[in-house]
């Protein structure tokens, strides 16, 4: 009886400890506020079509995160961490709209800035995968179509898709070509005030120090029957830009079925054991339908990050950093050999998390830990009960078979 009680207590403690471990970020919460085009008087200075600047302020106990999503030029997401709870964004709008003026966007006080990085979406590559290899770097230049330069896209008004209650916004853009006559490339931005996960795959774990971008290529007419796509990304930072991609492995695919890896494009001091300063994190999977099932998943892979000599064509980058910042870039390639081509569904989505500090780490859910505890604990319980029974039987006094004669 005591053994059974001990086993039940063990399972309950396991569930309690696992829940506390998994939810250790839930106690940290930021207060979020959103504003569109901060400091702009639209009646005096109307914005050009397709230009917008979304500012999300994430206030902590003694610091502030600032997210700025901008559609001027190539779409970009700027993350700035300050050690002040009163830091503010200041935009010199006449200079900002010129696109060639450095310092037209600032965080004040400037001395409060601890870290910053900008993720820029620069190009969408399309190639004719005649031999079904899904390895564009091994294809001749003739297999590639003219890339879509995202700086030339016409972007929708962010004000129409802004959701202040959910802290989300949808930025959709189109090329002037016929391929985008009924299609679009969209970036769904989400900011988070506390730890949690998205309901839909890939269900990335986020916390109060992170934001998320979901890239969706929908309804675009491919230029060949065997077209596949790659997305070019660039990162601009101060003294510590994102220079390497770490790939971590796991034995658990509970939240993203069949995916046992996570990739992290991280920023850390050179030749230092210091923790990660910032990151872009994703799972190597994309989906071919808006509400995917298991068969709609397709793997994706990244190239090795390389330094780039010039800044990306983003108005936000030049306005904040000027011309003296480190830039690295990589390509994200979707699909593998044997997978359906883009024209099968004319849909592709991929999700990336952008945040401060070390990336969130997946761990087993309480349900999985209970199953493991029961699966491993039941054999132990049987062994313990068997041992107890054997000991009891051995210690029980045995009746004498032969009675001596007096």
Curated annotation (Swiss-Prot):
Pfam families: NCU-G1. The chain crosses the membrane at residues 368-388. Residues 389-406 are cytoplasmic. Residues 21-367 are lumenal. Its main location: membrane. A motif (Lysosomal targeting motif) lies at residues 402-406. Glycans are attached at residues 31, 41, 62, 83, 100, 131, 152, 159, 182, 209, 225, 271, 331, 343. The keyword Ubl conjugation does not apply. InterPro entries: NCU-G1 (IPR029382). Keywords: Glycoprotein, Lysosome, Membrane, Signal, Transmembrane, Transmembrane helix. It is a single-pass type I membrane protein. Residues 1-20 form the signal peptide. One of its GO terms (biological process) is protein localization to lysosome. It is found in: Lysosome membrane. One of its GO terms (cellular component) is membrane. Interacts (via lumenal domain) with lysosomal protein MFSD1; the interaction starts while both proteins are still in the endoplasmic reticulum and is required for stabilization of MFSD1 in lysosomes but has no direct effect on its targeting to lysosomes or transporter activity. Required to protect lysosomal transporter MFSD1 from lysosomal proteolysis and for MFSD1 lysosomal localization. Belongs to the GLMP family. This is Glycosylated lysosomal membrane protein. It comes from Salmo salar (Atlantic salmon).
